[in-house]
Regions:
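Kelch-like beta-propeller repeat domains
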Residues: 2-190
Length: 190
């Protein structure tokens, strides 16, 4: 039962501030569905907003994040519920620079997972975590003055990136500012 639909409509136009975070350095954000937290991170600290308790806190890392969050890209892995930060493009192609690291909030520590690289930086790409196949998939984005139309995936067992080959069918054109959605009944991404 909706008692006052006019009030609900007007309330939906405004946002109520519940927390505020800022960083002097590059940062990223993600939702941790396992802990019901919003995490906002940079290289030296993580800011956490808990949706259950409605409290926020800042935690300085024991040692700085080994990955430079240039694009601020991350995901929370359901296999271990850790926050993974990834930046697989390295300006000079050096493969000894960490490009993926996992943060464990229980002991406030980082673990380097990969130094694997991709050929270009993918600004505004979309991503999907394939729990069944244990792969993190990215698509689209742009970098080096070109749009990306390829799928790349990272195997979450050995943390190696690879370019994926797609089955024949409709051509997928390069794009950015995209989103991906998974259909479990069809085992397909849209």
């Amino acid at each position: 039962v909706v008692d006052n639909p006019q009030w609900l409509m007007h309330k939906s136009y405004k946002w109520d501030e519940i927390a505020s975070f800022s960083s002097q350095t590059r940062a990223g954000a993600n939702y941790d569905r396992f802990r019901k937290n919003l995490v906002y991170y940079n290289r030296d600290s993580i800011f956490i907003y808990d949706f259950i308790s409605k409290e926020s806190r800042v935690q300085k890392y024991e040692s700085s994040c080994p990955v430079n969050p240039y694009l601020g890209t991350s995901f929370v892995n359901p296999a271990d519920s850790l926050l993974y930060i990834y930046e697989p493009y390295v300006e000079n192609g050096t493969s000894s620079v960490p490009t993926m690291a996992a943060y464990d909030p229980d002991n406030n520590s980082w673990a380097i997972k990969s130094c694997g690289t991709l050929p270009i930086r993918f600004h505004h790409h979309s991503s999907y975590l394939d729990e069944k196949r244990e792969r993190f998939v990215i698509f689209g984005g742009f970098g080096s003055m070109i749009y990306n139309g390829d799928f790349y995936s990272c195997d979450l067992n050995d943390y190696q990136w690879q370019k994926d080959t797609l089955p024949s069918g409709d051509r997928i054109y390069p794009r950015y500012f995209t989103s991906l959605g998974y259909s479990p009944s069809e085992d397909a991404l849209y």
